Amino acid sequence: MKENFWSELPRPFFILAPMEDVTDIVFRHVVSEAARPDVFFTEFTNTESFCHPEGIHSVRGRLTFSEDEHPMVAHIWGDKPEQFRETSIQLAKMGFKGIDLNMGCPVANVAKKGKGSGLILRPDVAAEIIQATKAGGLPVSVKTRLGYYEIDEWKDWLKHVFEQDIANLSIHLRTRKEMSKVDAHWELIEAIKNLRDEIAPNTLLTINGDIPDRKTGLELAEKYGIDGVMIGRGIFHNPFAFEKEPREHTSKELLDLLRLHLSLFNKYEKDEIRQFKSLRRFFKIYVRGIRGASELRHQLMNTQSIAEARALLDEFEAQMDEDVKIEL
């Protein structure tokens, strides 16, 4: 195996969760500017497309990263072990420091085809995928859920995953059936850690689910002794979620992050090949808590270009009465 960066991380370490159509190179750099986590994962890359001579062009932008983002981990999904083997070899050549396997995506057209969280119901295939991915020589980690249908599936499923000798397990503390409709099952953290200690003490354990910020993550790490904390949706409510010394933030800081997001979208649009409309999901992160925010968001949602969005921001900021503090 190549150098295992996981062993060099601080304890606890913090990860920005992989999120489809969210955690691309643009948004990762925005998060870095606000407050950087210890590890970045890419958004989802399909191994079947990656291994196809034509399909590769549709997913290559998902794997775009810059050297200042290291340690950079490629997050991949699929269900054919031989494709994971081939993908892992190529990812190592591309300079990634690790590979993370998606065994938790709950979306119906993924899970019901036996991929993502569907692999919870196919443990033998999941094991084959993990072992095949080691061919690239990079440390292999897994992101999964407690189970597919029921919470009590976690014991057999996680025992099986721990037995595969992986570098890190990121456990989303809900089942596939629960999606994100219920509170994460923090009450199971201690039992999961005990299972890890028994089966695979060298595998790191990262928790995910309803963790809004670094402060909460540190409290959970101190209480349960886990190794890592992964923050996902919390970053939409607080782009400064990974801040080591929390402080108050202002509306101008958020608008400055939006300007950065627009500039980075311009910079990487040739690599990512994304339409402008993909930006619209991000506007609500940056435009809130100030007079006129709702109207500005509405106007931004109707823009068709970076230039239009910038012009709206210029006009809005020129008329701002004051730079107000924002509750995150």
From Swiss-Prot:
Active site as annotated: C105 (proton donor)
EC annotation from Swiss-Prot or TrEMBL: 1.3.1.-
UniProt GO MF annotations: flavin adenine dinucleotide binding; tRNA binding; tRNA dihydrouridine synthase activity
Known cofactor(s): FMN
Record InterPro entries: Aldolase_TIM (IPR013785), DUS-like_FMN-bd (IPR035587), DUS_fam (IPR001269), tRNA-dHydroUridine_Synthase_C (IPR024036), tRNA_hU_synthase_CS (IPR018517)
Keyword NADP: yes
PROSITE patterns: UPF0034
Reaction catalysed by this enzyme: a 5,6-dihydrouridine in tRNA + NAD(+) = a uridine in tRNA + NADH + H(+); a 5,6-dihydrouridine in tRNA + NADP(+) = a uridine in tRNA + NADPH + H(+)
tRNA processing recorded as keyword: yes
Principal EC category: oxidoreductase
Positions of transmembrane segments: none
Positions bound to FMN: P18, M19, E20, K143, N208, G209, D210, G232, R233
Keywords noted in UniProt: Flavoprotein, FMN, NADP, Oxidoreductase, RNA-binding, tRNA processing, tRNA-binding
CDD domains with a match to the protein in the record: DUS_like_FMN
Matching Gene3D superfamilies: Aldolase class I (3.20.20.70), Putative flavin oxidoreducatase, domain 2 (1.10.1200.80)
UniProt xrefs under Pfam families: Dus (PF01207)
General function of this protein: Catalyzes the synthesis of 5,6-dihydrouridine (D), a modified base found in the D-loop of most tRNAs, via the reduction of the C5-C6 double bond in target uridines.
Family classification: Belongs to the Dus family.
UniProt protein name: Probable tRNA-dihydrouridine synthase
Species of origin: Staphylococcus aureus (strain Mu50 / ATCC 700699)
Gene: dus
